[in-house]
Amino acid sequence: MQKNVTKKMVLTAMLACLAFVLNTFVYFPAMAPFQHCVDVIAAVLVGPWYGFAAALLCGIMRMLSGRTIQAVTGAIYGPILGGLIYKKTKNIYLVWIGEVIGTGFFGAVSSYPLMKMFYGLDAQSPFYYIPFYTPAAVVGATMGVAVLVILKKTSVLERMQKELA
């Protein structure tokens, strides 16, 4: 049991660092699709809570490198919702829906009060950030599902999940 927890913790840290590096060097203005790609992969491999931890760690690192608090709020809900859906259904494609809804709606809406409180930005509506978060979540979640489908077809996903179980 302790060995598997250690493996999950190490993989969580590796996924957080992978997301940070990809988002730092492959940059699209106001978009972080690789965060959502890694969120989907984390939700399937390590589950919702370790996926949340990976997203939180990456978000904190991104904030320390000059991003806003949106680096955290835009990342943490997707792996939780996607991971819970995967835990219940074992369907990789439904993780996509969890990531897009978790980030595109919950992440966007939760950003509004924090941006207002910490940065003084009053966007007039809690739904203001949805059109900015959703495209990044769609693109990133699609990449994550594509990676998982390839891993599944080559039986690597099954071996990784057995190793972490």
At which residue positions do the language-model features occur?
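Loop-helix junctions at membrane interfaces
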Residues: 1-165
